[in-house]
Curated annotation (Swiss-Prot):
Protein name listed in UniProt: DEAD-box ATP-dependent RNA helicase CshA
SUPFAM superfamilies given in the database record: P-loop containing nucleoside triphosphate hydrolases (SSF52540)
Domain Helicase C-terminal as annotated: residue spans: 214-375
Gene that produces this protein: cshA
Domain (Helicase ATP-binding): residue spans on this chain: 33-203
Cited function: DEAD-box RNA helicase possibly involved in RNA degradation. Unwinds dsRNA in both 5'- and 3'-directions, has RNA-dependent ATPase activity.
């Protein structure tokens, strides 16, 4: 890696970065920063977690003048990403008279108008709210010299392509430098680049990253009715530090979250119907290690930048390769290894093949853990918990009960009975998940294949409710508006010999 000072930044910025613990530039920063400082348009293709914010944020702060008026506009797909970008920019601008304001939906617009009237140099926002301010003329483009689009493909996926064009058209090309970053380059983004950017220099770090992947990718073949039990078995054996679980629909996310909580896991869910206040609360808990598992739809997870995610579980297989790339990109960051496991119905294997072909690498087949492996993992977990409990002060009344029990029973038998109850307690909890049809062999459509009847899990796990099909109480014919594959808006069998579960290490 290259030292930041060699990239042409000022001594002040170099000192700021050093105080933040940034000593060497990432590949995307190494390539982008000199180009941005020269004023060239930059087209960067890199995944989230590769240092993109620094790639455009560091040169941006260097170019912003110490005078009132918006000089730079940054577009981001979600509120969370907008806030994260703004916080990074404020850190880069430490000690300088540079103000950064965020504008996004779900928050009172009056406060944002008041903040904009104070003359910030940088505005970070989501496309919809930025357009609101442009139409109200509370955001003026006269002095904007730098326009940045972060995660442009995500904004496209969320239906913002026309909004991006509208905003770019409001800032004449001869007036602005444009920097666009995207993990993928679909045709719509390529068209946007051709129409609105001036001879952009392409910076692409994806190939290098993919040749040395930090993410171990697996798939496990499992029928819908066995999926929840298999999933919790993996959780028990993996003991993930932080995990993100992806479900296809809002209903799936809600039911999975409730089921996990009932089993004793610390989980919360995110989807498009969650309020902004609740969303921020959930993300704060997740970042502060108050949660182990975040369950989310694709759209709800877009723009999230959470460090320390050790595992990604695709409870429902994504419908396209781009969604798969974005999902698993939540782990394996900052040089750390990550694990991604996709649960696939036998009739959905064509989707695995499509993902492998698009990414030019194979996923490894992984069998579900055996019951003995699960129990052994639970025993080790309980042993660790007991050791922690022993360091706490016990209530006198509990000590009295313990003394009485030890007088009546053999101490080893007594402890063994209590441990058995702890180890097997999860098996007694019965949960319900609505049956979801597997995807068809067609591209991007929900299929008609798969099992035709629901049933009960017998291994102590979930039950798929297939009763009262016409009454709206579950069943796979119960289609609701928020049950469509989550935009939140608008069979080949492969041998399972490849990798045994015992081969997988945390």
């Amino acid at each position: 890696m290259q030292n930041f000072k060699e990239l042409g930044i000022s001594d002040k910025m170099a000192e700021t970065l050093q105080s933040m613990g940034f000593n060497e530039a990432t590949p995307i920063q190494k390539e982008s920063i000199p180009l941005a400082l020269e004023g060239k348009d930059v087209l960067g293709q890199a995944q989230t977690g590769t240092g993109k914010t620094g790639a455009f944020g560091i040169p941006l702060i260097e170019k912003v003048a110490d005078q009132e008026g918006v000089q730079s506009l940054i577009l981001a797909p979600t509120r969370e990403l907008a806030m994260q970008v703004a916080e990074s920019l404020k850190a880069f601008a430490k000690g300088q008279n540079i103000q950064v304001v965020t504008v996004f939906g779900g928050m009172p617009i009056d406060r944002q108008i008041k903040a904009l009237k104070k003359g910030p140099q940088i505005v970070v926002g989501t496309p919809g709210r930025v357009i609101d301010h442009l139409n109200r003329r509370t955001l003026k483009t006269n002095d904007i010299h730098t326009l940045i689009l972060d995660e442009a493909d995500e904004m496209m996926n969320m239906g913002f392509i026309d909004d991006m064009k509208f905003i770019m058209d409001k800032i004449p090309a001869e007036q602005r430098q444009t920097m666009l970053f995207s993990a993928t380059m679909p045709k719509a983004i390529q068209t946007l680049v051709q129409q609105f950017m001036k001879s952009p220099v392409i910076v692409k770090t994806m190939n290098n990253e993919m040749s040395d992947p930090q993410i171990e990718e697996y798939y496990t073949i499992v029928k819908e009715l066995e999926k929840f039990d298999t999933f919790t078995s993996f959780l028990d054996v993996h003991q993930p530090e932080l995990a993100i679980v992806f479900g296809r629909t809002k209903r799936r996310v809600d039911e999975l979250t409730s089921a996990l909580i009932s089993k004793g896991y610390k989980a919360e869910g995110l989807h498009g119907d969650i309020t902004q206040a609740k969303r921020l609360e959930v993300l704060k808990k997740f970042k502060n290690d108050q949660l182990d598992i975040l369950v989310a739809t694709d759209v709800a997870a877009r723009g999230l930048d959470i460090s320390g995610v050790s595992h990604v579980y695709n409870f429902d297989i994504p419908q396209d390769t781009e969604s798969y790339t974005h999902r698993i990109g939540r782990t394996g960051r900052a040089g750390k290894k990550g694990v991604a496991i996709t649960f696939v119905n036998p009739i959905e294997m064509d989707y695995i093949r499509q993902i492998e072909q698009a990414n030019k690498r194979q996923m490894t087949a992984l069998r579900p853990p055996h019951r003995k492996e699960v129990l052994k993992a639970r025993e080790n977990d309980i042993k660790g918990k007991v050791q922690n409990w022993m360091s706490r002060d016990n209530e006198p009344r509990l000590q009295r009960i313990a003394t009485e029990l030890l007088g009546e029973y053999n101490d080893v038998d007594l402890i063994a009975s209590l441990l058995q109850e702890l180890v097997e307690s999860n098996d007694e909890v019965d949960v319900q998940l609505t049956f979801e049809k597997p995807l068809s062999r067609g591209k991007g459509r929900q299929g008609k294949g798969g099992p035709k009847r629901g049933g009960n899990h017998k291994r102590g796990g979930g039950k798929f409710d297939n009763k009262n099909r016409r009454s709206g109480k579950g069943g796979f014919n119960n289609k609701k508006k928020n049950d469509r594959p989550s935009s939140d808006r608008n069979n080949n069998k492969k041998s399972m010999k490849g990798r045994t579960f015992a081969d997988h290490k945390k």
